[in-house]
């Protein structure tokens, strides 16, 4: 069984819409709590979809392609730390990507985020799921599958799969994701 938790983001500002769900403004503290939560749940037979990877800081307009900006140093030293600790120390086998864009790229279709950092650098072997369904048109599911990072499309209809299954590249990427 799975659990959509813990929320591993850091508090980026005092008015963020999900601060009640996230542990702290300190990446190390949030990471330690996330790793302990994930480790305990995994030991008891439950996998945790650590969420919302990454930089999920606002609820307002997040469904409309909110762009979140941070430089690579800040992302690696602060905002990625809770997720990295949950993967490396807690043994997480499931991640939920965030709604927002990081820069101009939707997090769920970011090869840099989901393949290069999560899978290649941290050694994550597991499932990445999108955060709910695409209701407002900014999530490009074909790009998410083709980017190679997203395995499960939360709440998506069959039209997306029909479109992807009609191309050789789409078929290959869906097989790799499975």
Name each model feature, range by range.
Residues 1-178:
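Glycoside hydrolase catalytic-domain context in secreted enzymes
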């Amino acid at each position: 069984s799975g659990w959509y938790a813990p929320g591993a983001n850091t508090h980026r500002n005092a008015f963020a819409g999900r601060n009640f769900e996230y542990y702290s403004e300190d990446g190390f503290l949030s990471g330690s709590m996330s790793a302990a939560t994930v480790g305990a749940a995994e030991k008891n037979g439950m996998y945790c979809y650590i969420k919302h990877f990454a930089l999920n800081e606002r609820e307002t307009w997040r469904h409309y392609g909110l762009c979140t900006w941070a430089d690579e140093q800040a992302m690696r030293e602060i905002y990625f730390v809770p997720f990295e600790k949950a993967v490396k120390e807690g043994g997480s086998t499931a991640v939920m990507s965030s709604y927002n864009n990081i820069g101009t790229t939707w997090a769920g279709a970011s090869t840099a985020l989901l393949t290069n950092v999560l899978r290649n650098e941290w050694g994550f072997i597991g499932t990445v799921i999108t955060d709910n369904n695409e209701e407002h048109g900014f999530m490009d599911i074909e790009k998410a599958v083709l980017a190679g990072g997203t395995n499960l499309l939360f709440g998506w209809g069959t039209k997306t799969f029909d479109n992807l299954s009609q191309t050789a590249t789409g078929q290959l990427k869906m097989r790799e994701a499975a």
